C-alpha cells in the first residue's frame, strides 16, 4: 500500500544584483536568436575536433586569435588588480572596478560581427556577473568574513555563461568544456586571492601561472590537449564562420 507524502522545501540562493537580470535574459528565448540565423548557408563550418580549412590559416586569423587572447587576459587579471587596489586602499579602486566591467563588455563586443549585438551584450553581462561575485569574494577576504556562500554562488553563473556560448555555437563550444575551464579559473582565483591575503608568495605565483595557462596560453603537454579559454573562444568563431576569415 502506498500513501502520499508531501514535503515543504525551502531553497536559499545568493542574492547577486545581476541575478534577476540574467534570469530574465536566460528565460526570454527571444533574446537569443535562433541558431539557424547564425550560419551563413553552405559556409563549410567545422566542429571542435575537425581541422580548420587551409584558407583560414592566414595573418588575419592569427591577429584575431591574438586579439582574443589579449581581451581574455585583461578580463581574467582585472579581478586581481581589483584585489590589489582594494587591499591597498588606493584612490582608483572605483576606476579599477569599472575597468573590470569594461573588459567583460569588450569580450561580448567581439561576438557582435558574428552573432549580433544581443548575443554580445548577453555574454558581456554574464561575465560581469561572474566578476561581481569575485569582487564580493575579495571584499569578504579583506573583512575576514565567510566566503563559502559566495563561492557556491559562482557555479550557476558559470553554468549560465557556458549555456549561452553553447547555444551560440554548439559544435565548438560544448557547455561541459566551457564550464570545466571556467570553474578551474574560479578556483585559481580563489587560490591566488587567498594566498595573497595571507602572504604566501609561492602559492600566489603558482595560481597566477595557472590562470595564464587556463585562459591565455593553454596547458602544454596535456594528455588530451588543453586549449586555453581564449583559444577555444577564437577557434570556435573561426570554425563556425570560416568564410569570414578568408584573405
Question: Residue ranges of each PLM-predicted region?
Answer:
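C-terminal amphipathic alpha-helix
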Residues: 6-90, 96-100, 104, 136, ...
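Mid-chain, structured segments of secreted extracytoplasmic proteins
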Residues: 105-137
Amino acid at each position: 500500500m502506498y500513501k502520499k507524502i508531501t514535503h515543504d522545501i525551502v531553497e536559499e540562493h545568493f542574492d547577486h544584483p545581476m541575478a534577476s537580470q540574467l534570469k530574465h535574459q536566460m528565460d526570454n528565448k527571444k533574446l537569443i536568436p535562433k541558431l539557424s540565423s547564425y550560419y551563413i548557408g553552405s559556409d563549410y563550418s567545422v566542429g571542435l575536433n575537425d581541422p580548420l580549412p587551409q584558407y583560414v590559416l592566414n595573418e588575419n586569423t592569427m591577429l584575431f586569435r591574438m586579439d582574443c587572447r589579449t581581451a581574455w587576459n585583461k578580463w581574467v587579471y582585472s579581478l586581481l588588480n581589483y584585489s590589489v587596489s582594494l587591499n591597498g586602499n588606493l584612490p582608483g579602486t572605483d576606476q579599477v572596478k569599472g575597468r573590470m566591467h569594461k573588459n567583460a563588455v569588450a569580450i561580448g563586443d567581439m561576438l557582435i560581427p558574428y552573432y549580433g549585438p544581443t548575443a554580445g551584450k548577453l555574454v558581456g553581462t554574464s561575465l560581469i556577473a561572474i566578476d561581481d561575485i569575485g569582487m564580493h569574494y575579495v571584499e569578504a577576504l579583506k573583512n575576514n568574513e565567510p566566503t563559502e556562500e559566495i563561492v557556491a554562488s559562482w557555479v550557476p553563473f558559470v553554468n549560465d555563461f557556458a549555456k549561452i556560448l553553447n547555444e551560440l555555437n554548439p559544435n565548438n563550444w560544448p557547455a561541459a568544456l566551457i564550464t570545466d575551464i571556467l570553474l578551474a579559473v574560479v578556483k585559481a582565483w580563489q587560490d591566488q586571492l587567498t594566498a595573497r591575503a595571507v602572504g604566501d608568495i609561492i602559492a600566489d605565483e603558482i595560481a597566477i601561472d595557472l590562470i595564464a595557462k587556463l585562459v591565455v596560453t593553454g596547458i602544454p603537454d596535456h594528455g588530451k590537449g588543453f586549449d586555453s579559454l581564449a583559444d577555444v573562444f577564437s577557434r570556435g568563431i573561426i570554425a563556425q564562420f570560416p568564410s569570414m576569415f578568408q584573405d
